[in-house]
Design a protein with these regions (language model features):
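Gram-positive cell-envelope targeting signals
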Residues: 1-37
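Flexible, low-complexity linkers/stalks enriched in Thr/Pro that connect modular domains
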Residues: 28-30, 106-111, 183-187, 267-269
Length: 269
């Protein structure tokens, strides 16, 4: 009888101990954080790289959860350093919401500073900041459209002209500056010359096709194709070998019964 009681007590203790051990190992917290691994300390990508491109060569794993590579997120990307490199930081979370972050260098294969865009003629019968703000934007080879980053400072209006000083920067921290002249002309033109671009960037030594830049000639809401051959381009002192800004004027010749005028700017870099 006594042996049975001892055996029963022993089995009870074993069961209790086993239960406690089971609960401990089943319910214990995962105190280990995930690990992020890179196949190289620097990634080189094109300027308009996607998130998928930026995640190439990055893996993550966790002792409890296994492979977490598909859960990696891009946490932040710094501005350029002095060598035009950025620091890209990644983060990953395990199922217990423990996180790990790691960083590596980012280098672009081809990067160009932000460029401004102008969507309408720089010669207008309306001289308002609302009109100017809607016309001027900017693009970044990294960020795409950065119209919201453009800052415009106006100078003193004189002789029907207003200087515009433009500044813009993208996420790399690179700033671009440009000075334009916005002209006021209250002439009642009977038609409109529409251009493909009103701000044309070209490298020194190269030439822009100013004729091909003509999109259409409109009279009211109708396009007059025949008037395309009557557009006259005044290039002024345009010199493709000398960096600078050059005003280009498009108008209709005297052989038509219509009048029109618009202005574009060529930026020789």
């Amino acid at each position: 009888m006594k042996h049975k009681q001892v055996l029963s007590l022993f089995l009870t203790l074993v069961l209790i101990g086993g239960y406690i051990a089971f609960q401990y190992y089943y319910n214990k917290d995962d105190n280990t954080a995930p690990v992020i691994t890179f196949d190289s300390d620097m990634i080189k990508v094109k300027a308009d790289a996607s998130d998928e491109d930026l995640l190439e060569g990055v893996t993550a794993s966790d002792q409890e959860d296994g492979d977490l590579t598909d859960d990696i997120l891009i946490d932040s990307i710094s501005a350029f350093n002095s060598e035009e490199e950025r620091t890209i930081t990644y983060v990953v979370f395990d199922k217990d919401n423990k996180s790990t972050s790691a960083s590596r260098k980012l280098k672009y294969k081809k990067y160009t500073a932000p460029k401004f865009t102008v969507s309408d003629s720089l010669l207008q019968s309306s001289l308002t900041m609302t009109k100017i703000n809607t016309m001027i934007g900017a693009t970044s080879s990294v960020d795409g459209n950065i119209d919201g980053n453009v800052e415009i400072k106006t100078g003193t209006y004189e002789d029907h002209k207003m200087p515009l000083d433009l500044t813009v920067s993208d996420s790399t921290g690179t700033e671009s500056h440009l000075s334009l002249i916005y002209e006021y002309d209250n002439t009642s033109y009977t038609s409109d010359i529409v251009l493909k671009k009103y701000l044309i960037y070209v490298k020194a030594g190269k030439e822009a096709d100013l004729e091909d830049n003509i999109d259409s000639v409109m009279v009211g809401n109708s396009e007059y194709v025949d008037l395309m051959d009557h557009v006259v381009i005044k290039r002024g002192d345009l010199d493709y070998d000398v960096p600078g800004l050059y005003d280009i004027y498009y108008s209709l010749d005297d052989e038509t019964n219509f009048t029109a005028k618009c202005k574009a700017v060529v930026v020789v870099q």
